[in-house]
Amino acid sequence: MKNTKTAFITFFPAVPDNMGSSTVVNSRFKSWPSKKKLFQLSHIKKINNKNTKTIFIRKEKPLNKILSLPKLICSVFLYLKNSKKKIIIIEGASWIFYSFIVFFSLKLFFLKSKIIYISHSIESEIRKKFSNIFIYLLTKYLERLMFKFVDIATSVSKYEKSKIKKLYNVNTILYPNAINIDYKVGT
């Protein structure tokens, strides 16, 4: 995977590792074979180094995240612009609106890039239970577009894989959540 760069994108703090989704993302990131960088929105800690770029937001509110998307997109663009092969991994453990805006924008900049959408759940089903009808319908529409137009879409279980096929007529790759355990148990 020489000359390949991968941008991992999260809309929540993945570093430092502070919740289940961040543990899964960190495990995936650490085991990814090519040159890579994690781009995250975070209200916890601003971490900027060789492997991580944080767009810091004061409070974890949807409007703050929406207003931070242009800066996130610009950061990813600057990282990938000189790379021959570009892979963009969008971690879908946040509202699909953020994922869709980033997907659409980066696809305009990098037509030949490969974009992978890592679905952590069927979000429209969650929004149907816990959000108003407008947010539910918008989520379902954007989720349909994401599954249809990304280069690779994943699902975390056989149940969700079949449900996505039924809802959106899209075949996903089964990619269960996993973590890497890097410590040894003492005897």
Which role fits each region the language model picked out?
Residues 1-47, 83:
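N-terminal subdomain of nucleotide-sugar transferases
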Residues 179-187:
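Acidic anion/phosphate-binding donor-loop and adjacent secondary structure
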Residues 147-171:
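A short, active-site helix/loop in glycosyltransferases that binds the activated sugar's phosphate group
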Residues 77, 104, 108, 123, ...:
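Membrane-proximal helix-turn-helix segments that form the acceptor-binding/catalytic region
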Residues 159, 177-178:
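Carbohydrate-associated surface elements
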Residues 47-75, 129-135:
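A short, charged, and often flexible helix/loop element on the N-terminal side
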Residues 76-99, 112-116:
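Short N-terminal targeting/anchoring amphipathic segment
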Residues 119-131:
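A short, histidine- and acid-enriched strand-loop-helix "catalytic/donor-clamping" loop
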